[in-house]
């Protein structure tokens, strides 16, 4: 799900629940690699990255986590929870007009997860939540680099709709479970727990 969909809160609650049940967990996500995360953040702050360079930065960040965190954790018997995975990166790249085959080849090293939960929320609700949390909208999460609109609000709505459409397309190929995140934190977490129980039992 997008920023503001409740993703990070739900991951934390799932980790607490799984660990209370005796499962060892590891978390991964975007910009968490020791190799590339700081450089990626610095590069993004200038708002000057082209789409291919941005894609390669994120792919490097992912590949480093795959090699040094995800695979070793799975081998050790841990449950790995990803606060966004390659599907977010692929959707962003495809919306930015990168070649479909190139993008799929770039992420062909990724392991297929046991489950993908896509927390879906309307762009209008996402704007509200982002403003409540950060008091602003992010340049990249608003798709400002795409030239959709000079107005950041309008660009955000258009960009998030494009991403949502792309996720809907990808859902058929990658078997996403779409979860409506326009509900209370507790009720959303219970729904995710119910889905997770089917996998770990």
Where do the model's predicted regions map?
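P-loop (Walker A) phosphate-binding loop of NTP-binding proteins
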Residues: 1-2
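Conserved lysine of the Walker
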Residues: 7
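Hydrophobic positions on the alpha1 helix immediately C-terminal to the Walker A/P-loop
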Residues: 10
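NTP-dependent small-molecule kinase module
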Residues: 15, 131-201
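ATP-dependent small-molecule kinase phosphotransfer cores
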Residues: 17, 21-111
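Hydrophobic residues at beta-strand termini and immediately following loops
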Residues: 28, 119, 179
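Conserved nucleotide-binding/hydrolysis micro-motifs of P-loop NTPases
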Residues: 32-34, 86-87, 121-127, 185
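A glycine- and Lys/Arg-enriched "phosphate-lid" helix/loop adjacent to the NTP-binding pocket
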Residues: 89-162
């Amino acid at each position: 799900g997008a920023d503001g969909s409740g993703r990070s809160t739900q991951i934390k609650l799932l980790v607490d629940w799984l660990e209370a049940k005796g499962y060892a967990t590891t978390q991964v996500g975007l910009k968490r690699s020791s190799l590339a995360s700081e450089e990626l953040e610095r590069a993004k702050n200038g708002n000057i990255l082209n789409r291919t360079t941005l894609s390669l930065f994120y792919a490097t960040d992912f590949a480093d986590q795959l090699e040094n965190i995800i695979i070793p954790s799975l081998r050790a018997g841990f449950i790995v929870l990803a606060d966004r995975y390659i599907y977010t990166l692929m959707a962003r790249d495809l919306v930015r007009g990168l070649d479909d085959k190139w993008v799929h080849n770039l992420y062909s090293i990724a392991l297929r997860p046991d489950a993908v939960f896509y927390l879906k929320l309307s762009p209008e609700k996402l704007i509200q939540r982002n403003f409540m949390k950060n008091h602003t909208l992010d340049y990249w999460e608003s798709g400002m680099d795409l030239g959709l609109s000079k107005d950041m609000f309008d660009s955000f709505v258009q960009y998030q709709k494009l991403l949502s459409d792309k996720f809907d397309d990808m859902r058929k190929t990658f078997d996403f479970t779409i979860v409506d995140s326009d509900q209370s934190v507790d009720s959303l977490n219970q729904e995710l727990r119910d889905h997770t129980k089917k996998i770990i039992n």
